[in-house]
Amino acid sequence: MTSEFLGVFVTFFLGGLLGLVTIINPPATLPFFTALTRDLDDRETRAMARRACIYCFLIVVVSLFAGGLILTAFGISYGALRVAGGIVLGMLGHGMLYGKGDAVESMSHANHQNPAFFPLALPGITGPGTIAVVIGLSTEIRELDAWGKELTAYLAVVAATLAVCALEWALLHSARAISKRMGAAGIEVLTRLMGFLLICIGVQFIASGIRTLVTSL
């Protein structure tokens, strides 16, 4: 029994970690964050990085636990959500792979009262793709055959979210130094690689969704 729960934890932790790291793509937020904070001193920059990562964690956790309720309220099946989420992820991955314009860049000079939340945390770090990944994981968790496994899977995804937010914070905390070291070319290569992985995750979501829809007929 313990090995079963451990297997569930490892599976959902790694799945959540890979999905979130790929869609959030922490290094890709560095140029935007650097532009957004270029007029701030080091203390203000670190404070914004910390607040943004806290917001990101809350957004993901709320999406994880409330996703099922939202689906029920609108009468959306898990299979349909997975197919739709897979399409969204595939489109986002295609844009990253082929270098389409990033919507975040267009907001880099925006002036908002709380830029740590908008546009940095949402949609700069956690956008629609992130929410699609998390709700997709939520649908998989709800199909487990025991409440103990569901609880274990939820804890695994929360732990993965915490790990990704910690990574994001570490990168944003050192954004200015890292951007200089990687250069524009390095960040572009990494973004394209993440785009390809995102397409793969999207295809997997679509296949899983179609399988669920077919078996429910």
Regions picked out by a protein language model, each given a short descriptive name:
Residues 1-22, 99, 106-121:
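Small-residue-enriched transmembrane helix starts and helix-helix packing motifs
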Residues 88-108, 201-212:
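Transmembrane helix exit motif
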Residues 61-66, 125-139, 197-212:
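Hydrophobic alpha-helical transmembrane segments in multi-pass integral membrane proteins
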Residues 12-64:
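Juxtamembrane transmembrane-helix termini in multi-pass membrane transport proteins
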Residues 75-76, 170-190:
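Membrane interface segments of multi-pass transport proteins and intramembrane proteases
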Residues 47-96:
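Membrane helix-loop-helix hairpins that form the core translocation module of multi-pass transporters
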Residues 12-29, 78-88, 154-168:
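Structural signature of hydrophobic alpha-helical transmembrane segments
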